[in-house]
From Swiss-Prot, chains A, B:
Keywords: Lyase. It is an enzyme of class 4 (lyase). This is Putative hydro-lyase BPUM_0381. Its EC number is 4.2.1.-. HAMAP family: Hydro_lyase (MF_01830). It comes from Bacillus pumilus (strain SAFR-032). The keyword Lyase applies. The lineage of its organism: Bacteria, Bacillati, Bacillota, Bacilli, Bacillales. One of its GO terms (molecular function) is lyase activity. Belongs to the D-glutamate cyclase family. Gene3D superfamilies: PSTPO5379-like (3.40.1640.10), PSTPO5379-like domain (3.30.2040.10).
Amino acid sequence: MNIYQTYEPSQIRELIRKKEITGPTAGLAEGYAQANLMIVKKELAFDFLLFCQRNPAACPLLDVLEPGDPVPRKSAPKADIRTDFPKYRIYRKGILQEEVSDISAYWEDDMVAFLIGCSFTFEHALMLNDIPVRHIENGHNVPMYQTNIACKRAGVFHGPMVVSMRPIPAHQITRSVQVTSRFPSVHGGPIHIGDPAMIGIANVDQPDFGETSVIKEGEVPVFWACGVTPQAVVMHTKPEIAITHAPGHMFITDQRDQQLGVL
Amino acid sequence: MNIYQTYEPSQIRELIRKKEITGPTAGLAEGYAQANLMIVKKELAFDFLLFCQRNPAACPLLDVLEPGDPVPRKSAPKADIRTDFPKYRIYRKGILQEEVSDISAYWEDDMVAFLIGCSFTFEHALMLNDIPVRHIENGHNVPMYQTNIACKRAGVFHGPMVVSMRPIPAHQITRSVQVTSRFPSVHGGPIHIGDPAMIGIANVDQPDFGETSVIKEGEVPVFWACGVTPQAVVMHTKPEIAITHAPGHMFITDQRDQQLGVL
């Protein structure tokens, strides 16, 4: 429980814009969909849009903004994606150059912003089904791993899929597949269930992003495609400039989680 | 029942290529997904891809081919979209100029082909649920209508949604919503249920494309977004050149219908 749990999305965004909220956004404005960010120049926008279309589990699109337009007219028409994430990452030629809390100074008229669905939506649905979500129970960021699963290439964009992991009690795995499959626009059903080595994860206790989740007796690690994938792709593709959110520091949209369910 | 019902997709495509099959493809290679076609020049490809992303009910993408590549490497890697539809339409500046059975002579290195999901997939699922599909029962093309529902604009592309109509017995409407919602990549659940006038259809017995379906006592007209929408959009947007399939004359992919179900 946190004091911001029951705030409206617009209230949270205002606090973020004023830099009164600067940390991870899990649990804020509960019930509203949060989003990952990827910004590229217009000349790469077709390739990246095609990359998302070909890799819908990792990069499910909630909103694609008009070139040069920082306002997400579909998902939060009064917001501004240059100021409404708590933390951003600036990548130049695939290298993380800096983390900032406002990208107004970096924004250019030929940039295109992509908002990508976030697993926080289905975590709420898991908990409503009495399926435990360890990193929320323990109050830390979700563990994320680079895998040996290659994303489908599109134009210049290619790279490995990043996944998030949740330990699920064995008897609840089927239900966790059902619950998350309802939400394809926030990564959908799991990518992998069980042995981490099969998808190239050497040590499940050493995530590449986020923090370790303890796997208890009788639990199985279950892996979902993750919206941090574009950052791994940027590191491989090395565009002149790309701007993303910092993992866990998301954008809160005006769309309710339940509106994203396919049935 | 038709003699081609049990053929493999590759066999049907070969007969189409040899011009031994030249008519509508409904019921051919049953159980395999069929696709609508839209081809635009590379300079418009980002706008059209964004249009599809913003209008997923009307334009659910099964495959987007590389610029200049006529081979659908994801959905039918041994096919050629220039020869494997029975009939194509060539639009210049939004005007239908001609219908041809092969577009090899029109193909250019900077063209991008989009394969869009087709309702034939969910019709099979409806029938497996004992929900009647009138135009299949009566052996004619599905009735399609231009509506007053505006698609969401993307770049230069805008225009009205085209829908297909199936008369459904009132007590089976809920089930028809459930069954078709499983298949968002072939238009998903209905766009409208009931009074045709509410979506701008003046006379349900006079479709804009295809042929009339009789609505029996106790049945309600149910409308689904239709992959002919890009043709209405081309008429509004008037690009120099666009190539589509002729309504009902689809491409047969190697993907099974059931592989497109989200759950």
